Amino acid sequence: FEMQYCWSHSGVCRDKSERNNKPMAWTYCENRQKKCEF
């Protein structure tokens, strides 16, 4: 996957685009502007 902007929740970084109505879990994200790596 390429790096995408994400939003964090409970210390978990998730992708904005949801799959099967569930946010995809990514690596830890310290802020909403940070990009997540697969």
UniProtKB/Swiss-Prot annotation:
Gene3D superfamilies: Anthopleurin-A. GO terms for cellular component: extracellular region. Produced by the crural gland and detected in venom from the spur located on each male hind leg. InterPro entries: Defensin_3, Myo_ane_neurotoxin_sf. Its main location: secreted. Keywords: Disulfide bond, Secreted, Toxin. Pfam families: Defensin_3 (PF08131). It is found in: Secreted. Disulfide bonds join 6-36, 13-29. The keyword Ligase does not apply. SUPFAM superfamilies: Defensin-like (SSF57392). It comes from the Eukaryota. Does not show antimicrobial, myotoxic, hemolytic and cell-promoting activities. This is Defensin-like peptide 3. It comes from Ornithorhynchus anatinus.
